[in-house]
Amino acid sequence: MDSLTAFAAVGFAAVSWDGHFTKAGTRSFRHALDYREPFCQMTDGDMIALLDDLLDLRRALGAHEMMLQAAKCLTSAQCMTAYAMASELMRSDGPFEPEERRFLDHLAVILGISKFEAQRIDAVFEIFHARLTLSSTLELNPVIPC
């Protein structure tokens, strides 16, 4: 496995940790790659081929083994960024469920990320995805004069 595939495999495992691929999870994963070098430079065909390869790997190995193999192919800095991507993907649809928390804890161990660093990363996404109560003086349904 090359480092490009390995990095994507970590995110793919995060959105499919429970064996389900939701539309929102898949879209979030694709979005996470589409705005990151070198993935944003890939053609649609290359991106589809990568996603197909990841799906085949996931089916053949399972999420755990796929993550183990991916971790061997990434530098420490790449592992940190891959963990951050996984954390954001899992946090973006609401607070971490206990099973998601266990998955991320396990992922941190596999990637060699300390509990302190993992908590620091997760705290950022807790803030980033916090529920906000906002008010506005803007008219939500403006009346447009004829």
What do the PLM-derived regions correspond to, one by one?
Residues 1-146:
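Small-residue-enriched hydrophobic alpha-helices in membranes
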